[in-house]
Amino acid sequence: MASGRDPREARPGEVEIWDLSREPWDKWLRDMLQDLNQEARLHFGRELLFQVWNYCQEEGERHGTPMMERAYKYYRLVQKALFVHFRCGCRRRQPFEPYEERRDGQGGGRANRVPPGLE
């Protein structure tokens, strides 16, 4: 070749989740978290979701992870949990209501920030 350049398309590197070209990342993530949490609440209950959210927040604070990455970690964990739950065969017909949620109406969770969709 005269130019010395390879005419083939360059092999992409590792795709960064933050580089995806769609609506602003924070708006997309917030909308997805709300939808995911509404579905997850029917199968796992607020207490468990608050515990997962708190875990992601505490791990992120410990490692200095930005808030958006913490929220995305929570999203991935809950999404995987729902996948496994459905894969094992969900037999639930009613929303999840553990004793604590019926007793005081709130469930657990002492998070500084509430996961989107669980307000």
UniProtKB/Swiss-Prot annotation:
Subunit structure comment from the entry: Interacts with the P6 region of unprocessed GAG. Interacts with host VPRBP/DCAF1, leading to change substrate specificity of the CUL4A-DDB1 E3 ligase complex.
Protein's GO biological process: symbiont-mediated suppression of host innate immune response; viral life cycle
Note: This is an African green monkey isolate.
This protein's UniProt keywords: Host nucleus, Host-virus interaction, Inhibition of host innate immune response by virus, Viral immunoevasion, Virion
Region (Disordered): 98-119
Domain of life of the source: Viruses
Protein name as catalogued: Protein Vpx
Gene that this sequence comes from: vpx
InterPro entries membership: Lentiviral_Vpx_assoc_factor (IPR053711), RetroV_VpR/X (IPR000012)
GO CC annotation, single: virion component
Location of the protein in the cell: Virion; Host nucleus
